[in-house]
A protein has these predicted regions:
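Contiguous, well-ordered alpha-helical segments that form the cores/surfaces of helical PPI scaffolds
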Residues: 160-173, 196
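Conserved catalytic cores of very large enzyme subunits
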Residues: 1-156, 177, 184-209
Length: 209
């Protein structure tokens, strides 16, 4: 965060610098960009992150923020595998589109299956009111809860996550160059293009489902 640890003259920049050196060897800790435009209008005490996968802030079904919400189901796309199996860039996007569609279908299937499970499967979550609207479900018996879709009232506030691994390796395959700082810097736009391609699809599904 600017004025905290972002710039070299910030009070805690030394801690941020140390953290990045640790990340270079151990992949931890997890970072949160407090100046992210996606969360600028949300109470900073209600924003949360889950590892490297999900920023929990926006909510199309209820209250914004991370409180009483979580990742309901997740899936990861292996970008290098798709790139390695592609003959050219157009073929890559065609395969990526297919994999994204399959990922979406799998997540929806997981979500629907969870919502149909008997309420006893989520007793600890419900008794402690960990999820939004979970107090509604625990007041009813299993049959009533299932018939009234009470689990869905809780889980619909969660997130379905499509993650990915290996963006740098993916680009390396596509441009047929070894990974290096120069290769990464000269192909930043291709990297952004791939991310925009996936983001466009997930934004569409958020509105549709």
């Amino acid at each position: 965060k600017k004025s905290i640890n972002f710039d070299s003259d910030d009070k805690n920049y030394d801690l941020f610098s140390l953290a990045t050196r640790v990340t270079g060897k151990r992949m931890n800790p997890t970072y949160f960009n407090c100046d992210n435009v996606l969360v600028k209008d949300i109470d900073e005490k209600k924003v949360g992150i889950m590892g490297c996968r999900t920023l929990v802030a926006k909510n199309v079904n209820g209250k914004e923020g991370a409180l009483k919400r979580g990742n309901i189901a997740s899936i990861s796309i292996n970008l290098p595998k798709i790139a390695r199996e592609s003959t050219n860039l157009n073929n890559f996007y065609k395969k990526l589109n297919e994999i994204c569609e399959e990922s979406k279908d799998i997540l929806i299937q997981k979500y629907e299956a969870l919502c149909k499970l008997e309420i006893d499967n989520f007793k600890y979550i419900l008794e402690n009111n960990f999820y939004e609207n979970s107090e509604i479900s625990i007041e009813k018996n299993s049959e009533e809860a299932i018939n009234n879709n009470d689990m869905e009232k809780s889980f619909k506030n969660g997130t379905l996550s499509i993650g990915f691994i290996g963006l740098a390796e993916c680009v390396s395959y596509l441009v047929k160059k070894e990974i290096s700082l120069d290769m990464i810097e000269s192909n930043l736009e291709l990297s952004r293009e791939i991310l925009r391609f996936m983001r466009k699809m997930t934004d569409k599904w958020t509105k549709k489902y």
